[in-house]
Every structure is written in C-alpha cells, then in structure tokens.
Amino acid sequence: MKVRNSLRSLKSRHRDCRVVRRKGRVYVINKTQRKFKARQG
C-alpha cells in the first residue's frame, strides 16, 4: 500500500479505483487490480 499526500492522481490511475473513508483516513481501493491501494497520510 502506498502512502501519499494527495490521492487525486491515484484515483485516476485505473477506472475501478474508489475513494473511501475508514476510521478518519482516506483510502483508494481497487477490487480488480489490488496493486492500486493507497492511503492518504
């Protein structure tokens, strides 16, 4: 999982990327290509 300051560029890397909030943190998840996971931090 990558940790990035901004997730704007990461959510456009793949069409299945979704931005979700969990426990006060913002994540990018991808069900089909799991290598695109990221967390904002």
Curated annotation (Swiss-Prot):
Keyword Ribosomal protein listed: yes
GO molecular function per UniProt: structural constituent of ribosome
GO biological process: translation
Disulphide bonds in the chain: none
Origin: domain of life: Bacteria
Pfam families: Ribosomal_L36
Family per record: Belongs to the bacterial ribosomal protein bL36 family.
Stated name of the protein: Large ribosomal subunit protein bL36
Gene Ontology CC annotations of this record: ribonucleoprotein complex; ribosome
UniProt entry keywords in alphabetical sequence: Ribonucleoprotein, Ribosomal protein
Origin species: Ruegeria pomeroyi (strain ATCC 700808 / DSM 15171 / DSS-3) (Silicibacter pomeroyi)
